[in-house]
Amino acid sequence: MDETTKIAVIGGGAAGLMAAGTAASLGADVTIFEHMQYVGRKIGITGKGRCNVTNACTLQEFMENVPRNPRFLYAALSALTPDDTMQFFESLGVKLKVERARRVFPESDKAATIVNALRKYTQGAKILQEKVTSVTKEEKGFIINGNDARIYARSS
């Protein structure tokens, strides 16, 4: 093995960065695999470059606007409600504003504000600019192969 980590996160998008940051903040050894030039790249182009973070509504209101199979999303959305999302970003120092249709954006009107906050949140994690080519289950973890890296994520 080239390296060992406790937690491997495949994908440095919003969910990957939040998961990696949370694990790192709890003291875990975390490695993020991201095949793009840098983590959060797609976040930087959302909302026409402004990043619509969430909607300022209740979970019930949000679910009423899901066109198909809202029950599928219920467990995930109840674990991190729109209000939780706003509090999370505010705890990272991001000032938010609510616009028409209750869409929530960073006050700066720049998606880069969100990207930078998430990057700072993941400071304890190692980031590899690496495309994952395979994941193999082993007895006590996983082997994650990339184009130029091989990481063992141990399960104990």
Please identify what each model-predicted range represents.
Residues 2-15:
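Beta1/beta-strand and adjacent pyrophosphate-binding region of the FAD-binding site
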Residues 24, 118-124, 144-146:
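Alpha-helix C-terminal capping segments
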Residues 128-141:
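A conserved short coil-to-beta-strand element within the FAD-binding core of flavoproteins
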Residues 8, 24-48:
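Glycine-rich FAD pyrophosphate-binding loop
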Residues 3-5, 146-155:
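Core beta-strand elements of the Rossmann-like FAD/NAD(P) dinucleotide-binding domain
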Residues 15, 19-24:
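Small-residue (primarily alanine) positions within well-ordered alpha-helices
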Residues 37-125, 131:
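Conserved N-terminal/central alpha/beta ligand/cofactor-binding core
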